[in-house]
Amino acid sequence: MAKNKTIEERYQKKSQIEHILLRPDTYIGSVEMHTQLLWVWNKEKNRMVQKNITYVPGLYKIFDEIIVNAADVKAREKEKSENPMTCIKIEINKENKRISVYNDGEGIPVDIHKEMNIYVPHMIFGELLTSDNYDDAEDRITGGRNGFGAKLTNIFSKEFIVQCGDSSRKKEFKMTWSDNMSKFSEPHIKNYNGKDYVKVTFKPDLNKFGMTEMDDDIESLLFKRVYDLAGTCSVRVYLNGQRLAVKDFKSYVDLYLKDNSNDNKNNKGQNDNNNNNNNNNDENANQNNDNLDVSLSNEPADGTPTKNNNNNNNNNDEDEIVKIHEKQHRWEIVVSKSDGSQFQQVSFVNSICTTKGGSHVNYIVEQLLSSLSKKANAKNKGGMEIKSGHIRNHLWVFVNCLIVNPTFDSQTKETLTTKPVKFGSKCILSDKTINNVLKSPILSNILLWAQAKAQVELKKKMKAGSSKARERIIGIPKLEDANDAGSKYSQECTLILTEGDSAKTSCLAGLSIVGRDKYGVFPLKGKLLNVRDASFKQLMDNKEIQNIFRIMGLDITDKNKDDIKGLRYGSLMIMTDQDYDGSHIKGLLINMIHKFWPSLLKHKGFLSEFVTPIVKVQKGSQEYSFFTIAEYEQWKENTNLLGWKIKYYKGLGTSTDREFKQYFSDIKNHKIMFLWTGDRDGDSIDMAFSKKRIEDRKLWLQNFILGSYVDHKEKDLSYYDFVNKELIYYSRYDTERSIPNIMDGWKPGQRKVLYGCFKRNLRNECKVAQLVGYIAEHSAYHHHGESSLQQTIINMAQTFVGSNNINFLEPCGQFGSRKEGGKDASAARYIFTKLASSTRSIFNEYDDPILKYLNEEGQKIEPQYYIPVIPTILVNGCEGIGTGYSSFIPNYNYKDIIDNIKRYINKEPLIPMVPWYKDFKGRIESNGKTGYETIGIINKIDNDTLEITELPIKKWTQDYKEFLEELLTDEKHQLILDYIDNSSHEDICFTIKMDPAKLQKAEEEGLEKVFKLKSTLTTTNMTLFDPNLKLQRYSTELDILKEFCYQRLKAYENRKSYLISKLEKEKRIISNKTKFILAIVNNELIVNKKKKKVLVEELYRKGYDPYKDINKIKKEEIFEQELLDAADNPEDNEEIIAGITVKDYDYLLSMPIFSLTLEKVEDLLTQLKEKERELEILRNITVETMWLKDIEKVEEAIEFQRNVELSNREESNKFKVARKQGPSSMKKKKKKKKLSSDEESEGGDTSDSSEFLVNTLNIKKNTNKKTTTSSNNVNNSKKRLRKADDLNSNELDNTLSVSKTFDDNNNLTDNTPLINRLNDENNEFSSNNVDNKSTNKNSRKKKPKIADSTNDNNSELNSSIQINDNVNDDINITISPNKTINVNEFSSIKNKLLELGI
């Protein structure tokens, strides 16, 4: 501060005008030249362009104040105004440095203000702090606010002229100011008969802005503001006498979007394409007057994304014009895409151009960000997180709005600061707009950017270290680095990747032979990631792949690397188990190298595999090793396995250290080099692992030929052969475990469960966790752990709606409900199961011998498929996804299926079936060609209450409850007021409260649609393995049924043939035994004091059949274990004559001595006669009759199982009712019968007759007279099961409890003879046999009794049958003390008893 200034000089007071001129930046912004990137009008291109211009913000502001005043006239205009505003005319004369702005509409009163005593135009244009915007109680949507406005333009002008026409007062006003509003003329008033208008003409004082003339930059900026008015004011706008071809905001936006994609390229140094046809396109763009539209082209918006067909541009995403428009009260929005570098916005508040945006722009953008963020991250699942800032950079938003009493950050009004709650209106973007944005290239651009960004980040993460870091690797657990890795000898080093830690240990044992200098070992944790289509997140989080890159010295940024120079290891060796999973691991590693460094695969010697035997066989000094199961199977088919010792090597861990040392000592013969033979190698790798080539993989699997395998005698293996001869076995296996077979409807895991249950004869309850161990042991299940098998068992026992129509296992415990779709099942260690009562009727045990059983590691396991009586694939449906294939088949009603089977047998047309789900109360309706819709039940109780009593199939109660909670808490679209959930684990009951108006609207739209009570059952993807194990897609359910019926009849032919040969075998054995005994009795054959060899030779010469000739019934497959057992007894298997051994006559020579009697001969002759009669019956029966008899038994068994289920449910419901009635009702318990000591030791409560029936297949009549309807149904089923043609069921008034059967000697025994397979004179085949060997000593069931006919005082007489079998084969059956049936013909009644399951 200067010391010589006086106080008066230091402290001054300025007038308002002096202050404005002295400090202009406070009022109009800077008056200095600024260079800034702005949108301006390009006269040559006739559109907006963004470029750097040099201008003075203050000059721009004084022009803006005048044109905003003109726009305010339109904003203040009332509906049906007498003087509507129609146009704004602006003249900008750069040469004369003069600007004028004219507008019509409601004018300024040409009258004297009584307080100011001057004319009103004079006051508002020539007096500071005057305005009509000071009443804050009034809601105004104008641009003016503070009372400066046009006065600032006046102050910064050399000349300022105002002209006004007042039609109501018939006067015209004109007044001129000059020299920065310091001088003014007297108002000039004259009479006027025209319409209202206001015209302001001014000459800016360019000296105040450091300018001498108006240059092109300021002109282009002012022209742009004129176009702004045309787009935001909805009036005609003229510039220098020419009307602007902009009619509305949409056409205004076109001035930015058209060809600006090319401008963005220009900014990056690329060429620009001109397009001067905007005016015509603007006219077209206004043809659609809808409030909401979306366009991706220059064509009229029709809501459908289209490509820009401009011939000057390529039709690619970069050239697409996105224009998504929505118009609401006081708001108009257009959403487009930016170039991704930064967020762009063009916005207006009350016609003011807010160049920096503000709260109104954020208000709109935040709505877009919320939806885009959710969708983008969902589509980019597994990739890098896409944040709101990233998404914002891809948006270009145009906003034109009217805000009540807006506030800005400064007088320059570049940024709106009004809070959204004070906007005076709301603009919630519609769902249609949001959806159109999500479908537009905006989202795809965001995802592309995210992927590009991810690649950059990934390269940083995966980039190999420095050369020094490559010499020694530290910090990688379990790596056994080669001593020479990273050194000058690194090209000679090999990294061995092993499948697991145990394989690594075995490998190290082998390395003790060849040394550690040139070999490193790194164990893989399991299967590598499929990097072909892996996400960013997957790659970034996969430490194992990163470690492999580091160990090898591979750099992900060097995709063209084609040699091994610079690597820490010159080659890579894969050491995995020789099974399907091992092949998959090899494929994944090959896929990884091919994805990142395809050229390395062409380098011979870079990639190899170490192979170990999967099977070894030895016989004496002979030893063979097999490297694939297929190779072993081929050898086995052409070899007599007698005497061979066979050892299976499940994994690398099976080999001993000694064997691994042996392998490495001969490493050349255990090493196969992968070889690149051409482009087909790369194509086959891509086909096997690319998600985009699903159809190619389908064709690949369809052309699969069983028996083609890699020849391990060859030391080179092409990648093409690896994929097509080894990897395909894994893909085939993956599909087999996911897609069921048409014959039994089972996947391998389910088939193993059924096989284990049948083998264990699971009649009594068994804990699921224990059953899993048994099944794994007896079916060679070792692929996916116990948890997977446990879930399979649980699924097979589930009974809730949407699960099984027929459950083949009993759910003894909590096996899940429709509450959570079975996910609420208890742990396997808490629940029990057993075979359901209908299972053995459907999977008839007499089909077991004709099935083709699989063999794994010499162990007989489950069959290729079972052959049920009815097609269970249609009964319970299926769902699965495998390699290249998926399948879905809905459930169907077993009654409809059986009816169609009968039509098939009778050669009648089949009737199409509609899907059916047990206990489902809703509707199932066809939706056309794709399938069916399942529809729940919703009823209107009153005008504000709804009740939902059924949900669609596969829509679970808990999920639906969460859906209702969303409807309740959704602030934007709250549909319901409240809901009450009274659903149980079985039944659905939701009571919903709604606003009556919303309920009525929902009814109009459709309650089932609004409340999502529909689900789809597709019938277009019925893919199954056919009987020949080929994948087949079936068009309809009837195609499946026809295929099944054809194969089922063939199976009955096989069953019949088997039983005939079985009877013939037994007949031949009886005949040989009879001949043998008679020979000994008649001294025709002397067996004592003879060697076995001599005796066998004599038997053969005398025509006795060796057992191997009799045993033609035995299946062709001879299981290896039998041969191994035979190898342990060489004496018995020594060939005596013509291939005959001692064992071939054991069936004769091992007969007990007391059998060598004439009585036995008579007995055998009787048996022989019976066998001949049985054979005659069997040969005469047709396979169709056999099937119909089986179907009858199946129907009865299913009905019985269903009635038991309903009875149990009814009992449960009784408990629920009793609980509601109070404690007193619960005290009424049925008095239990006092148990005997024997019964107590067996846990002998026998009150649950239905459970007793299910477990033992014995029949017991319910004597409780107060039986409910469901109980009667159960009893009716029991009666049907025990009914015999010649026994009146009314005579069976007492309990019938029988567990014994007759053997061929007419003795009561536990052994079931073949005749038990023939139910009646028509040779009906039974499906309800009882295997009494399964009776458990720890069973809690009461032992059934056979009454002693000699005990007249038997206390159990009223609860049992007395059977008296005399020497004349007469059988007396005592039903009650006074009722006895005598039957002379043994075989007839015997068959009748057997029909009862005895």
From Swiss-Prot:
Cofactor-binding details, from the entry: Binds two Mg(2+) per subunit. The magnesium ions form salt bridges with both the protein and the DNA. Can also accept other divalent metal cations, such as Mn(2+) or Ca(2+).
Reactions catalysed according to its record: ATP-dependent breakage, passage and rejoining of double-stranded DNA
Compartments, record wording: Nucleus
Listed cofactors: Mg(2+); Mn(2+); Ca(2+)
One GO CC term on file: nucleus
GO BP, sorted A to Z: DNA topological change; resolution of meiotic recombination intermediates; sister chromatid segregation
Domain named Toprim: residues: 493-608
Biased composition (Polar residues): 1287-1300, 1348-1357
Site note Transition state stabilizer, residues: 829
Binding of Mg(2+) 2, residues: 577, 579
Domain spans labelled Topo IIA-type catalytic: 739-1191
Presence of the UniProt keyword Isomerase in the record: yes
Matching InterPro entries: DNA_Topoisomerase_II, HATPase_C_sf, Ribosomal_Su5_D2-typ_SF, Ribsml_uS5_D2-typ_fold_subgr, Topo_IIA, Topo_IIA-like_dom_sf, Topo_IIA_A/C_ab, Topo_IIA_A_a_sf
EC number(s) on file: 5.6.2.2
Superkingdom of the organism of origin: Eukaryota
Site-annotated residues for Interaction with DNA: 527, 530, 697-698, 747, 781, 788, 956
Renumbered residue ranges of the record's region Disordered: 260-317, 1214-1250, 1262-1361
Top-level class of the enzyme under EC nomenclature: isomerase
Catalytic residues as annotated in Swiss-Prot or TrEMBL: 830 (o-(5'-phospho-dna)-tyrosine intermediate)
A Pfam family reported for this protein in Swiss-Prot or TrEMBL: Toprim
GO MF, one annotated term: DNA binding
Additional note from the record: Eukaryotic topoisomerase I and II can relax both negative and positive supercoils, whereas prokaryotic enzymes relax only negative supercoils.
Function (record text): Control of topological states of DNA by transient breakage and subsequent rejoining of DNA strands. Topoisomerase II makes double-strand breaks.
Oligomer status and interactors: Homodimer.
PANTHER family in alphabetical order: DNA TOPOISOMERASE 2 (PTHR10169:SF38), DNA TOPOISOMERASE/GYRASE (PTHR10169)
Name of the featured protein: DNA topoisomerase 2
